[in-house]
Amino acid sequence: MKDLFKLLKAQAKTEEFDAIKIALASPDMIRSWSFGEVKKPETINYRTFKPERDGLFCARIFGPVKDYECLCGKYKRLKHRGVICEKCGVEVTQTKVRRERMGHIELASPTAHIWFLKSLPSRIGLLLDMPLRDIERVLYFESYVVVEGGMTYLERNQILTEEQYLDALEEFGDEFDAKMGAEAIHHLLKNMDLEQECEQLREEIVDVSSETKRKKLTKRIKLLESFVHSGNKPEWMILNVLPVLPPDLRPLVPLDGGRFATSDLNDLYRRVINRNNRLKRLLDLSAPDIIVRNEKRMLQEAVDALLDNGRRGRVITSSNKRPLKSLADMIKGKQGRFRQNLLGKRVDYSGRSVITVGPYLRLHQCGLPKKMALELFKPFIYGKLEICGLATTIKAAKKMVEREEAVVWDVLDEVIREHPVMLNRAPTLHRLGIQAFEPVLVEGKAIQLHPLVCAAYNADFDGDQMAVHIPLTLEAQLEARALMMSTNNILSPANGEPIIVPSQDVVLGLYYMTRDRVNSKGEGMILTGPKEAEKIYHAGIAELHARVKVRITEYEKIDDNELVEKKQIIDTTIGRAILWMIVPKGLPFDLVNQVLGKKSISKMLNTCYRILGLKPTVIFADQIMYTGFAYAARSGSSVGIDDMVIPAHKAEIIDDAENEVAEIQEQFQSGLVTAGERYNKVIDIWAAANERVAKAMMDNLSTEVVLNCHGKEELQVSFNNIFMMSDSGARGSAAQIRQLAGMRGLMAKPDGSIIETPITANFREGLNVLQYFISTHGARKGLADTALKTANSGYLTRRLVDVAQDLVVTEEDCGTLSGIVMTPVIEGGDVKESLRERVLGRVTTENILQPGKTDILVKRNTLLNEQWCDILEEHSVDNIKVRSVVTCDADFGVCAYCYGRDLARGHLVNKGEAIGVIAAQSIGEPGTQLTMRTFHIGGAAFRAAAESSIQVKNHGILCLVNAKFVINSANKIVITSRNAELKISDEFGRTKESYKVPYGAIMAKGDGANIISGETIANWDPHTMPVITEVNGFIRFTDMIEGQTIIRQTDELTGLSSIVILDTAERTSSGKDLRPALKIVDANQQDILIPGTDMPAQYFLPGKTIVQLEDGTKITSGDTLARLPQETSGTKDITGGLPRVADLFEARIPKEPAILAEASGIISFGKDTKGKRRLVISSLHSNDSYEEMIPKWRQLNVFEGERVERGDVISDGPESPHDILRLRGVHAVTRYIINEVQDVYRLQGVRINDKHIEVIVRQMLRKATIINAGGSDLLEGEQVEYSRIKIINRQLKSEGRQEITYVRDLLGITKASLATESFISAASFQETTRVLTEASVAGKRDDLRGLKENVIVGRLIPAGTGYAYHQERARYSKHREEALDMQQITAADEASANLAELLNSSLTNHKH
């Protein structure tokens, strides 16, 4: 038995935990935490500063004020540890127990916990099924509630006013029982039979037809069940005992001058205790009811204020009108416990200083000021001094360091050798905001930073500051070196391109070095190699730009890392030959033999990394930087005012424009054009003029004519300094040069509209006062925008991180066969993103076959690297199905194959990689570069004329997709389908262009025809929508009665008459129910059927349609029967930039969204109501029909009798992602969100890999709603984690029971974060009170799966290097459980054996 007891004791002590559970505390539990009751509101004696007995700081309850010393001083020192002083009753122990010992207050009357009352939806209200208003009236003593109805007609939970109560008392006497206040509610909650109530509701819900009622019942069932399962009792939501926080967590600090600084909680507790004591006294005196009631109400209010001040009634303020901070305020918000102390902690061993350039550093180094290093590495120095025997004690070592003796510096050098430090620049928007470097000691007080890492930090040297952190433990140093060293972060995790890219001076230096100049000194020489080139350059025999022939030795890398040498004489320049000396072996000479701008340098580094790997790339990057700086200095580039050459034609262009404007002004005054047209035309004219000036200026700047060595004129690229800076990509853009030397052009007002008088001057000429004033308009808006943008972008990043934080790569391969189909992104005539860019680094889902053959080109589950992409391009594969995070089958996290390549490392992603956080950072980090504004269409900034034709840009073959068409009498193709697309593909079948073709477009060529570039192949009238017949025959009017449904109009100019259908609103009452239509009949007046269906060919005409044919006219298929004028959509604002990205990720439903067909079938219209028309879709295969009411002002894309597929657009508008998910499925919504988000980023030139957006989409699709619960105990209409449904379904399938059917839900990122399984993560994000209330009622358990929860409980995160630790812990705990089970079994066996022995022996003793 002893062993068993030992075992139990050992188990109670363990600190290891795998999950955290939150639940309601019962009164007994609160008493068990407590070390005594707080009876008095006093805190400490103001003279002696000793805590008062039984007060809020009482030493007897909470522990001693000084370590191992009782209050009266009878027991001091360690030897009396654990003694309780008989005089003052204080236990002799450490002071720190005052941080953990709690007290309690016995409340004289029960009080409702405000969180469960007022946090919506009110838990108490839902449980009792009473409105919150009524419960509040009971709690705050305004009305009675019946607790026992007895034999009367009064029911339980019925509310009675004072008068009704008195009447009932007269009538029934004491047959019934009604109470008020929290006691009443407590009584009701206590007497609830949860399980019976649950059964009853489950029976009720089956017969309920109304949606709202069912939702309400489902909510109640869920709440009741959560109480049953969690073991919480409903009456615990009413407090009888109030716990008191340990005093050291609500300190009271004496200030000088006899005042005290105190925590607000003390004030709040004091009010509660005062009111409680007063209430006790009143109850003892048996005071009149009304007084007691008032006191109880005051107590309730005091407890409310303590728990959550300001939740109900007015906020309780302190003496200086500041609201008191209650317990709820302590944990919520940015300054609350979660975000301030648990997720963001201050760290020791850190420093910060201004940064300056360290152009001589290596990529893995940073310059650390000596003063700083001495302070930061102090403990290491002390240790080293002691080990070396230079100091005898730590104290001596301290003295030596303070005196800064010479030997200390030597020791410091040794200590910092190969000890990496971490540099961080705020704001840390992505993981490259913290990198590790080896410190190099420098004089001065500024940290020196390597110029190439500035791009990753987004740092510049205009006064930026950076922080230094020291990794202390060996493991930390190891991680810093192996994972965070700047040399390991060459590629950006957002797009897999190099982020260590030279910029500014370096680019200018390399550009200058690789340019060629006609007729420069030394031209035409033939040199033996780069060494000689350098020699003659330094000797001044040849110039840097001289065109020469050089013998170049190239090395080509063959598969098994062998280098093959190849020598040849190449035409190049001296500069390029010199640059070739630093290029590592294995790269081709063409990389250098060109004019190097920023893009080509980036490409060169990328190639180097892919061919040669990490180490040569790092060395190469450093060399590029040194060389670039050296030659930028040599070039002597600087900007002078004469570099800004103003084009000669400028004045003439501006005069022309002014004349045109004057002409339009005249037309406007004589009333030929409207004000709007005049404004638009003026802006068009000026925009065109600006373009012409800019073109003239650039032509002038960019080239110059020079004489070559043969005395002939030759055009060469200019050596103008400003042009060189812009052309190389070092600084400045064409738009900025235009403002310096062209004209500033049109300016926008802060509201986005364009001022019609442009600034014709440029900065070189100088602006006059008016021009300057107009300039400031836009500039100020720019600054205001930037400030707003930063905050918004940061908030978006925070929401993204929160939704994706728990997504980690957890397995190698989930074995799924599904994936998403990737095609190149083509908009109109441009390939915006090639297939290669989209599939690089993804894993194939299925075997890819050679186009047109059955040979396998790429096997399934192949990671597509650069070589595979080359093969795919050779064979011109046009679409590929690749694995995606969205379709990954892993239950928790995702698998490596579905994610593909780790972009920052260039190989398949490792297990434990925190891909969620990386995705969130990659999307959020460029957020500050996006615009904030909403574009107004209007003005030259953004105006597209209504499209009316398609003109192709490339040669190729025409291909129609989803197109239905008829051939008209002129033998042209007329499109009759709604979502036809037209693609132009080259001879290999690769799509080059793609366009949408509207209904009624006339095509010049058919499917499969050859097209030459510049040809117009389709045109249509953008202002009307035609009605096109698909059959031949004669027209017959039906229900077209003049004056009732139609009127005739005659055009004044042409004299042609036409029939116009009246809108239903304009018709007389007799014409309201008539439905005008055109029927197509044959010569015998018999109906003609639409080909392929059994529907007669008749076309119902909506209001405002214009018909130009007469009754009985002969028509042929493809003719236009009628035209419906389309209002061109007014100037709708295009939401762009950051707000658009936020809208997409929040899955917001747009205003006036597109209406999509809910089912496939034939369209017809039912009976209209006042403002809406009834659209009916009848299924082709069954008798089902689907009805929908659509507002009349919505313009429909479909005619009666037309066939639609589920998910087709019926009325145009922005599509709602929820509709896309419901009608077209997960793949479609993924594609939609990816494309829309990418459009915004592409506009700003930011590249982000699709993977990252897919990761966020996966998290948005985490939940599903249950349609049929099958064999599980879930409820219909309940929203459940999708992974949970998958697991339950697998289980049900194996047991042969019915599986759950469900639909996937799309949640916005904020909602998804709050709906996560982990309540700790949700509570630390937003709405802390609501999340915690919900979690505690349900008795939720947090399994600590995500990263955030583990940071909060102070563990290593289950990602990266912590992943292995968590795997190991899981294995260990499983092992331990098994061992414990075994031990318990053996111990029990032993105990029973011993017992048997005992009994036997006692029996034998008796016998004797």
UniProtKB/Swiss-Prot annotation:
User: Does the keyword S-adenosyl-L-methionine feature in the UniProt annotation?
Assistant: no
Q: Where does Mg(2+) bind?
A: 460, 462, 464
CDD domains under this entry? Answer: RNAP_beta'_C, RNAP_beta'_N
Which parts of the sequence bind Zn(2+) 2? 814, 888, 895, 898
- Cystine pairings recorded for this chain: none
According to the record, cofactor stoichiometry and binding are noted as: Binds 1 Mg(2+) ion per subunit. Binds 2 Zn(2+) ions per subunit.
Checking InterPro entries in the record gives: DNA-dir_RpoC_beta_prime, DNA-dir_RpoC_beta_prime_bact, RNA_pol_asu, RNA_pol_N, RNA_pol_Rpb1_1, RNA_pol_Rpb1_3, RNA_pol_Rpb1_3_sf, RNA_pol_Rpb1_4
Q: Pfam families per the record?
A: RNA_pol_Rpb1_1, RNA_pol_Rpb1_2, RNA_pol_Rpb1_3, RNA_pol_Rpb1_4, RNA_pol_Rpb1_5
Known Gene3D superfamilies for this protein?
1.10.132.30, 1.10.150.390, 1.10.1790.20, 1.10.40.90, 2.40.40.20, 2.40.50.100, RNA polymerase II, clamp domain, RNA polymerase Rpb1, domain 3
Its recorded reaction(s) are: RNA(n) + a ribonucleoside 5'-triphosphate = RNA(n+1) + diphosphate
MF terms per GO, please?
DNA binding; DNA-directed RNA polymerase activity; magnesium ion binding; zinc ion binding
As recorded in UniProt, its EC number(s) are 2.7.7.6
Requisite cofactors: Mg(2+); Zn(2+)
One GO biological process term is: DNA-templated transcription
Q: Name one GO cellular component term.
A: DNA-directed RNA polymerase complex
What are the alphabetically sorted keywords of the record? DNA-directed RNA polymerase, Magnesium, Metal-binding, Nucleotidyltransferase, Transcription, Transferase, Zinc
Positions contributing to Zn(2+) 1 binding: 70, 72, 85, 88
Membership in a protein family: Belongs to the RNA polymerase beta' chain family.
The record's listing under NCBIfam families reads:
rpoC_TIGR (TIGR02386)
PANTHER family attached to this UniProt entry: DNA-DIRECTED RNA POLYMERASE, DNA-DIRECTED RNA POLYMERASE SUBUNIT BETA
Q: What does this protein do?
A: DNA-dependent RNA polymerase catalyzes the transcription of DNA into RNA using the four ribonucleoside triphosphates as substrates.
Q: How does it assemble?
A: The RNAP catalytic core consists of 2 alpha, 1 beta, 1 beta' and 1 omega subunit. When a sigma factor is associated with the core the holoenzyme is formed, which can initiate transcription.
Q: What is this protein called?
A: DNA-directed RNA polymerase subunit beta'
Gene transcribed to yield this protein: rpoC
